[in-house]
Swiss-Prot record:
This is U3 small nucleolar RNA-associated protein 25. InterPro entries: P-loop_NTPase, UTP25, UTP25_C, UTP25_NTPase-like. Residues 1-112 are annotated as: Disordered. Residues 60-72 have a biased composition (Acidic residues).
Length: 716
C-alpha cells in the first residue's frame, strides 16, 4: 500500500490500484538525520536519511480532466419539437459522420451497453445529444401529475418566498435556535433551526418503514426488498433526511454504515426522479398553452443535482451497488468499465488487520477519482459528462484536480452551481487525507456560473438567480466521530433553512477497553494553553521541560539499563512530529538519546530498520505519527512505555497504541508499570470525551486510571 498523502499537499500522493504504486524521492534537498542509534553501531545501521516523498498521481484514462471541460457541455433545447427537428436534420446530413448506433438485445430485460473509451472523450455526437428524448426519459405524465412534489423538493417557491427571506435573514445574522434531547441507544440529538421569532419548529415524527415515505413508484417497487424494518435510530432520522434537513451524523459504525448508505441513496434517487418529472410536467404544460406566459421555474443553472464525496474508489463501488439495487435499470452503459477501473480484490495479507481498516482500504483504495452518472427511464450511464450528469461521485482530491487549474481561464466549477443535495460519507477518513480539499469543494458549491452552459434562465428558480441556493441545499455528513474541522463545516456550510441536526453518541471511554492481560497505569497531564493558535507552542514547551527531561535521564544508563529503552512517542500531528524530530536530532539536551522516527512518508526500508533498532534496544525511543497508524496499522514490538504527545482523534487508536504494551507477554508486567502518559489541553475536549468517557469530567490536574477494575485518583 502506498504511503499516504501529507497534509497541505494538493497532489502529493494517490493511493492507487495495486501494482502501480511507485515511489519518487524528493530531489534537490539535503538529507536530514531523522534518527540516532547507539554510537557503537556500524555505519550501515544508521537511521533513515530522508523521508520519502509520496508517489505522483497516476493519470486516469477513464476520467481525465478533459472529460469534464466546460467547453464540451451539451446544449439544452428550448422545445422538444425543435430537438426532434435537429435530430432529423442530422440524420439526413450525408456529409457529416454517421451517428454511432448501439446494438441492444431487446429480448433481454437488462442490457449492458459498452461504449468505447474514445467515445467518452469529446465525441461531439454524444455530447450534443438532447437531454430529453421520447425514447428514454418521458414517462407517463398522468403518473407524474398524480404524484405530489414536496416543497423542499424542487417545488414552486413563489408561495414561500417571504418565509424563505425571513429564514435567510436569521441565518445570515447567526440566529439559530437549538434544542437538545436524548435518543434511544445512548445517542444525543441537537436540532437547530433559524430563529425568525415565530413558533418553535418541531422535528417530524419517527416512522417505522418505507410506507411512510413518498417515494416514486419506480423506487417503491424494489426498495422494500432491501430496506426493511427500521431500527430506532433510522426511524428517527429517516423523516429528517427525506424532509431535507441538514444532518451531521457522528456515530457511523461498521454495523450501521450499509443501512444509512442505502437510505441516503434512496433519498437522492427519489430527489432526482421527482425533479426530472416536474420538469417534464412543466414542459407538457408549456406545449399545451404556448401563447401563455407561464412562470415555470423548476431548474437550476446546470443539470447535476447531487454530489456524493467519498474517500476511495471502493467506497464509490459500494455506493453504486446500493444505487443499482434500488434503481432497476434495463441498461447500464459502461458498467464493466466502471468495475474494471474502480473495484479490486481485498489484500489477503490483511486478515489480521482491524475491521475498520479493511473496510476503508480494502479493494481499490485510490483516493483520486470522479464519476458522473446520468439516469434515464431505462438506463444508468456511467462516466457521463459532468454537465450531462444528474449525480457526481468523487473524492475531494479528484474534484479539486478538475476545478483548480493554474490557468484561471481553465478553472471550471460551474457544474457545482446547482447542487441540491451534498453528501459526505466517511468524513473521518477524509480528515486523514487532506481536509483542505473538502473545504475547497464546499466553498465552490452553489456559486453563480461563469458561463450559461445552454441554460434557459426563464426556468431557473429564483433562489438560484438571487444567489441563495446554499440556503436551500441539503447537506448530509456521516462520520465515525466529530472533530473541530467537521464542526466548522457544520457551522459554516450547513445553512439549510429547514434546519439541521447533529447526532453524537454517548462514549463509555476508550480507557476502559484495553486489550491487555494486566492493569496498566494511564496518566493524563494537562498543560495550560491560552488559544488554539498557541496550543502547538505551549504543548512543545511542556513536552521538552516536563516530559523529555526525565526520558533523557533514564536513557543515560545505556543499553544495559532496562529502563533506558522501549519508549514510544505517539504524535498526532505531522507538523508536531517534524518539530520534535528536529529537536531530538539537533538539541544538546538529547545528544545522548538514541531514537528512530516513523511517519507517513518514511520509506518501507527505513520503517523496517527503525522498528528493528527499536525492538533490539539500539533506539531508546521511537517517534510514531497518528496518520502512519491510520494508513498502516503497524504492530510495534518492544514498547515498554507510551508517551502521547497528544491524544488521538480516533478513539480506536488509543486501545491499539496502548495495546503495544502487551505484545510481548514476557514483559507485560514491566510494560504495565511503565504505563501511558498523555498530554492534553482544554482544546482537546472532543478527543478527551472519546478517551475518558462522556460522563467523566475532563481532569484539571494529572490523573490516572487503572485498567481493571476502573478506578480514579487525582494526583496533587
Amino acid at each position: 500500500m502506498a504511503a499516504p498523502r501529507g497534509k497541505g499537499s494538493r497532489s502529493s500522493n494517490s493511493r492507487g490500484t495495486r501494482g502501480a504504486r511507485g515511489k519518487r524521492q524528493r530531489g534537490g534537498r539535503p538529507a536530514f538525520e531523522t534518527s540516532r542509534v547507539e554510537k557503537n553501531n556500524d555505519d550501515g545501521s544508521s537511521g533513515s536519511d530522508a523521508e520519502a516523498e509520496s508517489p505522483p498521481i497516476d493519470e486516469l484514462s477513464s476520467d481525465s480532466d478533459d472529460d469534464y471541460d466546460a467547453d464540451g457541455e451539451e446544449k439544452k433545447m428550448d422545445k422538444p419539437y425543435n430537438t426532434l427537428l435537429q435530430l432529423f436534420n442530422t440524420s439526413q446530413d450525408t456529409n457529416g459522420p454517421a451517428r454511432k448506433r448501439r446494438k441492444v438485445d431487446h429480448n433481454s430485460k437488462k442490457t449492458e451497453i459498452q461504449v468505447e473509451e474514445q467515445d467518452e472523450l469529446h465525441d461531439e455526437a454524444d455530447l450534443s445529444e438532447p437531454e430529453i428524448t421520447d425514447d428514454d426519459e418521458i414517462e407517463d405524465l398522468a403518473d407524474v401529475a398524480a404524484e405530489e412534489v414536496e416543497a423542499g423538493d424542487s417545488g414552486d417557491e413563489n408561495d414561500n418566498s417571504s418565509s424563505l427571506s425571513l429564514n435567510i435573514k436569521a441565518i445570515s445574522s447567526k440566529g439559530w435556535l437549538s434544542h437538545k434531547s436524548e435518543l434511544p441507544g445512548r445517542f444525543r440529538l441537537m436540532f437547530s433551526h433559524p430563529d425568525t421569532g415565530g413558533d418553535t419548529v418541531q422535528l417530524p415524527a419517527p416512522i417505522h418503514g418505507l410506507q411512510s415515505l413518498k417515494l416514486k413508484q419506480k423506487l417503491a417497487l424494489h426498495a422494500g426488498d432491501h430496506i426493511t424494518k427500521f431500527d430506532s435510530l433510522a426511524s428517527g432520522l429517516a423523516p429528517s433526511i427525506f424532509g431535507y434537513h441538514d444532518l451531521l451524523f457522528g456515530a457511523r459504525t461498521l454495523s450501521n454504515s450499509a443501512r444509512f448508505r442505502d437510505l441516503y441513496c434512496l433519498h437522492v434517487l427519489n430527489h432526482i426522479l421527482k425533479t426530472r418529472d416536474r420538469v417534464l410536467k412543466n414542459n407538457s404544460r408549456s406545449q399545451k398553452v404556448p401563447d401563455q406566459d407561464l412562470e415555470l421555474r423548476d431548474q437550476g443553472f446546470t443539470r447535476p443535482k447531487v454530489l456524493i464525496i467519498l474517500p476511495t474508489r471502493q467506497a464509490c463501488v459500494r455506493v453504486m451497488e446500493s444505487i443499482t439495487k434500488l434503481y432497476h435499470a434495463e441498461q447500464q452503459e459502461n458498467k464493466t468499465k466502471f468495475y474494471d477501473t474502480f473495484s479490486a480484490a481485498d489484500d489477503k495479507s490483511w486478515e489480521n488487520k482491524p475491521d475498520d481498516f479493511r473496510e476503508l482500504f480494502g479493494g481499490n483504495d485510490d483516493d483520486m477519482f470522479r464519476l458522473g452518472l446520468k439516469f434515464t427511464r431505462k438506463t444508468i450511464k456511467y462516466f457521463s459528462h459532468f454537465y450531462n450528469s444528474d449525480m457526481i461521485l468523487a473524492s475531494p482530491l479528484g474534484l479539486r484536480m478538475v476545478m483548480d487549474k493554474e490557468d484561471s481561464k481553465k478553472q471550471d466549477f460551474d457544474f457545482l452551481s446547482s447542487i441540491e443535495v451534498a453528501i459526505i460519507d466517511q468524513a473521518d477518513a477524509l480528515l486523514m487525507q487532506n481536509w483542505e480539499h473538502v473545504e475547497y469543494v464546499f466553498s465552490h458549491l452553489n456559486l453563480q456560473p461563469k458561463e450559461s452552459h445552454g441554460c434557459d434562465f426563464s426556468r431557473v428558480r429564483n433562489w438560484y438567480l438571487d444567489g441563495q441556493a446554499k440556503y436551500v441545499r441539503q447537506t448530509l455528513v456521516f462520520s465515525s466521530f466529530i472533530t473541530p474541522e467537521i464542526n466548522a463545516l457544520f457551522s459554516s456550510q450547513m445553512q439549510n433553512t429547514a434546519g439541521k441536526l447533529k447526532i453524537t453518541p454517548t462514549y463509555a471511554g476508550a480507557i476502559l477497553d484495553l486489550p491487555l492481560p494486566v492493569p496498566v497505569k494511564q496518566t493524563f497531564s494537562r498543560f495550560d494553553s491560552t488559544s488554539p493558535v498557541n496550543d502547538p507552542e505551549n504543548r512543545f514547551k511542556y513536552f521538552t521541560n516536563a516530559v523529555l527531561s526525565p526520558l533523557v535521564r533514564s536513557s543515560t544508563g545505556g543499553r544495559g539499563n532496562p529502563s533506558a529503552s522501549g519508549t514510544l512517542i505517539f504524535i498526532p500531528s505531522y507538523l508536531d512530529f517534524v518539530r520534535v524530530r528536529n529537536y531530538l536530532a539537533t538539541s544538546s539536551q538529547t545528544e545522548n538519546l538514541s531514537f528512530g522516527a516513523i511517519s507517513e512518508y518514511t520509506s518501507v526500508r527505513d520503517v523496517a530498520r527503525a522498528r528493528t533498532h527499536f525492538f533490539s534496544g539500539r533506539h531508546s525511543a521511537l517517534l510514531y505519527t497518528e496518520r502512519t497508524h491510520h494508513f498502516r496499522r503497524y504492530q510495534i514490538r518492544g514498547v515498554k512505555r507510551v508517551i502521547m504527545y497528544g491524544v488521538p482523534e480516533n478513539p480506536v487508536f488509543w486501545a491499539e497504541i496502548v495495546g503495544f504494551l502487551g505484545l510481548d507477554p514476557a514483559g507485560a508486567a514491566e510494560a504495565a508499570e511503565g504505563g501511558v502518559r498523555a498530554l492534553f489541553s482544554k482544546w482537546d475536549a472532543l478527543k478527551m470525551e472519546r478517551i475518558v468517557g462522556t460522563k467523566s469530567r475532563m481532569p484539571r490536574r494529572n490523573t490516572f486510571w487503572s485498567h481493571q477494575p476502573p478506578s480514579f485518583l487525582l494526583l496533587e
